[in-house]
Amino acid sequence: MQIDEKLLSKLEKLSALQITKNRNETIAQLSEIVNFVEKLNELDLDSQEITVSTIKGGAPLRIDEIRNSNVIDEVLDCAPKKQEHFFVVPKIIE
């Protein structure tokens, strides 16, 4: 797939991003990425066995045990601001 100025402008609009640096450099980088993905698509993987886990026989299961935990309190203790059981963050949407 050839990436040109027109396609880059369309991608910029669709992604709601603004590319302000050297556009030629950006086009070259995107072209390299697309070419690499196209090479990956050329690989014949039909003869390969599907791998769900790297551990033979799958991951060992563990028994679910009910334990008392203060994870919420421990996490909130690290927060700069908290209120009851919630993080307090600056308002970003008006």
From Swiss-Prot:
**What's the top EC group for this one?**
ligase
Keywords attached to this Swiss-Prot or TrEMBL record, sorted alphabetically, are: ATP-binding, Ligase, Nucleotide-binding, Protein biosynthesis
Q: Which Gene3D superfamilies match?
A: Glu-tRNAGln amidotransferase C subunit, N-terminal domain
InterPro entries reported in the protein's UniProt record: Asp/Glu-ADT_sf_sub_c (IPR036113), GatC (IPR003837)
**Reactions catalysed:** L-glutamyl-tRNA(Gln) + L-glutamine + ATP + H2O = L-glutaminyl-tRNA(Gln) + L-glutamate + ADP + phosphate + H(+); L-aspartyl-tRNA(Asn) + L-glutamine + ATP + H2O = L-asparaginyl-tRNA(Asn) + L-glutamate + ADP + phosphate + 2 H(+)
Q: What is its EC number?
A: 6.3.5.-
The molecular function GO annotations come to: asparaginyl-tRNA synthase (glutamine-hydrolyzing) activity; ATP binding; glutaminyl-tRNA synthase (glutamine-hydrolyzing) activity
A Pfam cross-reference name: GatC
Q: Which SUPFAM superfamilies does this UniProt record tie to the protein?
A: Glu-tRNAGln amidotransferase C subunit
Provide one Gene Ontology biological process annotation. Answer: translation
The source's domain of life comes to Bacteria
Family under the similarity heading = Belongs to the GatC family.
Q: Which HAMAP family match?
A: GatC (MF_00122)
Assembly: Heterotrimer of A, B and C subunits.
Query: According to its UniProt entry, what is the function of this protein?
Result: Allows the formation of correctly charged Asn-tRNA(Asn) or Gln-tRNA(Gln) through the transamidation of misacylated Asp-tRNA(Asn) or Glu-tRNA(Gln) in organisms which lack either or both of asparaginyl-tRNA or glutaminyl-tRNA synthetases. The reaction takes place in the presence of glutamine and ATP through an activated phospho-Asp-tRNA(Asn) or phospho-Glu-tRNA(Gln).
Q: Which NCBIfam families match?
A: gatC (TIGR00135)
What protein name does the entry list? Glutamyl-tRNA(Gln) amidotransferase subunit C
